[in-house]
Every structure is written in structure tokens, then in C-alpha cells.
Amino acid sequence: MHKIMKIYNSSLILLLFFSFIFSNCENKGKNITTTFLSKNTTKNKLKNVENFDKNTQTIHVLVALCDNKYQGIVPVPEKIGNGQDPDQNLYWGAAYGIRTYFKKSKDWKLLKSEKKDSIRMERLIFQHISKKNYYLVADAYDGQYIKNCTADFLYSSSGQMKDVLTINNTRIGLYGNSRLVSYIGHDGLMDFQLSESFKNTDNQTRDCIILACYSKKFFSPLLKETKANPLVWSSHLMAPEAYILHDALAGYINKESAEQIRSRAALAYSKYQKCSEKAARNLLVTGW
């Protein structure tokens, strides 16, 4: 038993070590200035458009690009920590960023890539290879607008923000019209507060995945207002990389249980972070 506990403790320490190195979520007293455009002043104001093909299922992923300058993080190498350069960014164009990882996936086909605006620097639209009614839309938010990205995620989870887009003559839902909404990036709620109301407006429960450090602790108070269902989020420092979401979605699309989806996420984390499965399960949790 002593030997088993020693192995487990070593795995947990290793997990936390790698999480610290790669998550870069801890603010070491860093003074930051985060730009925030409120819903009343931004062009990206709240919409409530609901007319879309109800046979489609959208997964909308909002990514706050890693940003050494505008986020309260332990700095990463300059090349991958430029929040205004999605092509090289840790959470987008790097090897385990959303764009690179999903473009290489055998499960998803990239239909379109487009530049959006000064806040959402790029949008990707994927379609699932076998379950063709499933679409994944990923938006890369300029890192200095992490507050907008966080707010848009919560507005979407609550049903306050809804939109649509047309791809190959099919109109699919976005934001609150999505079946699942995901946030990926630094946990900005460790650095700032949001005073907006994210109260659910349509009595619908949306699924969500939040890949950010301590996301259960910091997102819980606001997420409860939205009535969303947290399928996967974190209990500690973590590296919010694309393979976690990718493998979790494989279970989600197959209509697996929340525990099975969480298990897929943990197994992926264990594999890529070289930590024990048990340690990964302690990090990536499901439900309240």
C-alpha cells in the first residue's frame, strides 16, 4: 500500500508540475490591462436570432488566445504568447492548439476559415465526418479581449446570446443556439470580475466544457445562473489543450454519459501530459 501511495503521489506531483509549466495560469502579482467592450458599445453586441435548421447540432468553442501582455499569466515564449497572432498562438496555431489539432483530426473536416473582426480574429467551421449533422465552430478571440470571450461564453450558456450562420446552404446555430458551448484559455476570472447578469432566459439547459485553470472554482457562481450543465471542467492548474476537447467530443457525439465523456478527457490528458490516469481524473471533473 505504501508503494502504491508513493507512486500515486509521484504522479500527482508530476501532473501539477507539468500543469504549472504549461498552464501558465498563475498571476505573479502582474499588473494587467484587459480591454473590455460591453454589450452596449461593441459591434459584437448580443443577438437573439433563432431561425436555423433544428436537425443540426452545433458545438461552439470560444478560445481566448494566450497573451503575455494582456493576461495575468506566467509568461510563455513570446512566439506562442502573442495574443494578436493566432497563427502561432499556444491555444490556436501551435501543435496542440484548436486550429492545428482539429485540422489534423480524422473525425472532423474543415469547411471554412474566415477572418471576423478585431475581437474575433478567426473563425473555423468544421463538420463531423460520420455524424454530418454535427458542426463545430471555433472562434479565436484576440487575447486582450479575454473578458469579452468569457462574457460571450456565459451569455451563450444562458441563452442571452444567439446567432446563426449559413454554410453549404445549411443554416446552423451559434452561441446559445448551440447544443454545447466551450471556453478554452486562461481563467480570466482569477484576475477580473464580471458585473453583467448571466441569468438563463429561455429555460434551456446547455452543455458546456470549460478548459481553464481552476475553472470549477471560478466559473461556478456565474455558471449556476446560466443553468448550464458542466460536462468537463478543472479542479486545479491545467494545460487547456485541444486533445482534451477533441476526445471528450467523441463521447459526446456518441451520446455517452457525462462520466464517460469526462473519462475520455482524463485519458487524453493522462496520455499527453504523461501523468497517471487517476491524477488526471482528479483534475478533470464533471458536474457540480
Where are these predicted regions, by residue range?
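Bacterial N-terminal signal peptides
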Residues: 13-20
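C-terminal motif of bacterial Sec signal peptides marking the signal peptidase cleavage site
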Residues: 23-24
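Boundary/activation segment at the start of structured domains
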Residues: 29-108
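Catalytic cores of nucleophile-dependent amide-cleaving enzymes
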Residues: 171-251
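Caspase-like cysteine protease fold
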Residues: 260-288
